[in-house]
Regions:
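SAM-dependent Rossmann-like transferase core, predominantly class I methyltransferases
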Residues: 33-98, 103-111
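Acidic, low-complexity/disordered tracts enriched in E/D and polar residues
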Residues: 1, 41-43, 66, 303-396, ...
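Flexible, glycine-/basic-rich loop-and-beta segments that form/coincide
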Residues: 252-331
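Conserved Class I SAM-dependent methyltransferase catalytic core
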Residues: 124-125, 190-245
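Short "lid" loop at the C-terminus of a central beta-strand within the Rossmann-like core
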Residues: 153, 170, 187, 216-221, ...
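Long, charge-rich, low-complexity alpha-helical segments
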Residues: 1-41, 88, 99, 104, ...
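Conserved SAM/SAH cofactor-binding pocket of Class I
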Residues: 80-165, 171
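Mobile active-site "lid"/loop adjacent to the S-adenosyl-L-methionine
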Residues: 126-127, 165-196
Length: 445
């Protein structure tokens, strides 16, 4: 982790089984007379998913602090925040085949193999593939095939049940003097790499197959970047369901500074100022005022696409011990269920309020009538639904025993309103709460 040298004796004591020679053969250490130095970064990594807790050891290249200088362009990144975000988002359903596009150190491929029978992992970097294969061997994970190449070229003509990608989406000026780090720079202008992924993924998905990735998108002038992403999805030759969530935005200067520091160039130096100028010139020339970051879930539609959701969730999420992927999977199933039901069929369901939902009421002192009712979700995306008296009452009465129709009928009498009008008012909210996981469908007896 620290990149510090150690004596041969200390290294032998720390590696009683592998030994220094074994570590050298694996490319983990370098020996210079009486001292050894690490050739790579080796860290423990632990996580919890739907299959339970697990621990791995992950090898990557030494970071800036250990090297003492800026990163080389062929640097292979270890497990960072983006890696853990994507692995947490990963659907955890059984799959026959999975693809990890842009595998880097191989962390997503290792996660995918826990649920897929066979995984293909690709990267443009031979060094990355070498370390990814080492990580698979180091952790006793088989069933992963490693291939060299860009984007979907290494899997031409193949289709997968699940595609995951933490692609090199960082927006980088295409000018001399700006490092093109393989782990983050896809070699395209602006956010074209994310657009290219969306355009190409459909033909590599089995019907009903899902692709998940992280990405950036640019705000040009005063246009909405999510509208641009929607246009990419609509332009896919293969019909796609889409769920895109923007998690954050950063202005042009802040974005540039973030990624210049990420490469190990320090603020206050001439090199930093030169790179910052290149980034800002590029953004100004192309009219970019800010950059969004978020999650994309794309599914090859089995017919006409029914899911088109583009939203912003910039705050904190709910508690998800086994990862947000569990909630995403449940949301997809709930979406498909309600999309196939007309209002009469939906009304016949007996729903139950999820166990992590709480109700919050705001009242003026001395008043019995709430001025606001909020239904808060503890897990999933941690959503808050603003409810009126009718929706709050329906939610509270949803115990899995009474149908939606029965609850609406009783509420109409209690509130002295027209039952049909109340149903028309409540059912769209019921559909949304079902998809978002505030309401669930228990087994229907």
């Amino acid at each position: 982790m620290l990149g510090r040298a150690a004596t041969v004796e200390a290294a032998e004591a720390a590696l009683p089984t592998l030994g220094i020679e074994g570590a050298q053969e694996l490319g983990l250490l370098r020996r210079d007379d009486a001292r050894v130095t690490p050739a790579v970064d080796l860290r423990p990594y632990s996580f919890v998913d739907a299959l339970g807790p697990a621990e791995w050891w992950i090898v990557s290249d030494l970071g800036e602090l250990a090297l003492g200088h800026a990163l080389p362009e062929d640097h292979v990144l270890g497990v960072g925040g983006a890696s853990m975000t994507l692995s947490g988002l990963m659907l955890q359903r059984p799959a026959r085949t999975a693809l990890d596009l842009g595998t880097g150190c191989g962390i997503q491929a290792l996660h995918a193999r826990r649920h897929a029978e066979r995984v293909v992992a690709t990267d443009i970097s031979p060094r990355a593939l070498e370390l990814a294969a080492l990580n698979a061997d180091l952790n006793g994970v088989d069933g992963i095939e490693f291939r060299l190449g860009s984007m979907f070229e290494p899997v031409a003509g193949e289709r997968f049940d699940h595609i995951v990608s933490n692609p090199p989406f960082v927006i980088t000026p295409r000018v001399d003097g700006v490092p093109a780090y393989e782990y983050r720079d896809g070699g395209m202008v602006g956010d074209a790499l994310v657009a290219a992924f969306i355009a190409g993924c459909g033909e590599h998905l089995e019907p009903g197959g899902v692709a998940q990735l992280l990405g950036n998108w640019e705000y040009h002038g005063y246009t909405d970047a999510l509208d641009r992403v929607r246009g990419w999805v609509d332009g896919s030759a293969t019909p796609l369901d889409a769920w895109v969530i923007e998690r954050d935005t950063e202005d042009a200067a802040g974005y540039a500074e973030t990624w210049i520091r990420d490469g190990g160039t320090r603020p206050g130096t001439a090199a930093f100022d030169q790179l910052l100028g290149a980034w800002l010139d590029d953004f100004e020339e192309r009219g970019v005022r800010q950059v969004g970051f978020g999650y994309l879930l794309l599914r090859r539609a089995e017919g006409v696409p029914t899911l088109r959701r583009f939203e912003r969730i910039h705050g904190s999420l709910g508690a998800n011990e086994a990862g947000l992927g569990v909630a995403l999977d449940a949301a997809l199933a709930a979406h498909d269920l309600q999309a196939a039901l007309d209002d009469d069929a939906l009304s016949a369901l007996r729903l139950a309020v999820a166990g992590d939902v709480t109700e919050e009421r705001h009242l003026w002192p001395g008043s019995d009538a709430p001025t606001a009712i909020l239904l808060r979700q503890g897990g999933g995306f941690g959503r808050t639904v603003s409810a009126d008296t009718g929706l709050a009452a329906l939610t509270g009465a949803s115990d899995g025993e009474l149908s939606v129709a029965a609850i609406v009928g009783a509420l109409a009498q209690l509130l002295e309103v027209d039952e049909a009008a109340l149903r028309d008012d409540l059912l769209p909210a019921v559909r949304g709460m079902l998809v978002d996981g505030l309401l669930t469908v228990p087994p229907q007896g």
